[in-house]
Curated annotation (Swiss-Prot):
Keyword Nucleus tagged: yes
A cellular-component GO term for this protein: nucleus
Annotated gene: TADA1
Region (Disordered), start-end ranges: 83-103
Name of the protein described by the UniProt record: Transcriptional adapter 1
GO-annotated molecular function: transcription coactivator activity
Amino acid sequence: MATFVSELEAAKKNLSEALGDNVKQYWANLKLWFKQKISKEEFDLEAHRLLTQDNVHSHNDFLLAILTRCQILVSTPDGAGSLPWPGGSAAKPGKPKGKKKLSSVRQKFDHRFQPQNPLSGAQQFVAKDPQDDDDLKLCSHTMMLPTRGQLEGRMIVTAYEHGLDNVTEEAVSAVVYAVENHLKDILTSVVSRRKAYRLRDGHFKYAFGSNVTPQPYLKNSVVAYNNLIESPPAFTAPCAGQNPASHPPPDDAEQQAALLLACSGDTLPASLPPVNMYDLFEALQVHREVIPTHTVYALNIERIITKLWHPNHEELQQDKVHRQRLAAKEGLLLC
């Protein structure tokens, strides 16, 4: 692993020296490529514009070092993922070998003013294959947590933007745990709005969706729930072989459960439908501390509202008429 880190730092240093003042623009383009805002071809074209012809190889070496560091196996066809670099070819392409033929002035004039197609130098448009969407590694597409290699790649780019040289394994592990705990906090806020729960130590929520509900007309029920033994008593000097964090005795726990069941109501709570976007929207509005950053909070609220939108009958009818017109142009008939 140390070898890969040294290779990455050496490749980054060589690339920074080759870029010079254009290093900030290169990191910005690299970030856009990681976010799937631009394609690999567009990123290579921008790198080719920022680098000289003799320093293009530093761009390829840097990308190869990142992929090796993140342990991502990428299989690309030959010549599709790298920029051309004419290493030691001193001869100019296109010049035929042999003696030059003398041409008249008229031939030179006609050759110079031949009409050209202005679209010949434009970039060729390539239709995107729907199967290429499988290459996207965003959480919103895969519906899964990002892998350790993906997080490390994003962290390396962010570190370079802030002037850092490397990302340690401990930092990657901390981000992985932070993502998991952040999602658990969001799920806890959603479930706590739908189901009853109990509190331990005044802040820890547990026992979600318990079927035992207190009877509000019985005075015993309030006392039973308030005097609930949630944690074992703290021993100042535990005896030898005694675990201070042990659970209450089985007889006490059974007696406590029987008392709660006797003080509960006769009817069970109604079953709820699965969690939907409305529950998430309400939970984030009530528990705003779950997402403390205002920018991230506002962006996710907008995305939730967009998901909740659905077309009305007039828009559905207009869409149907539009599809029928398109089908009529193509010679098809929609039922």
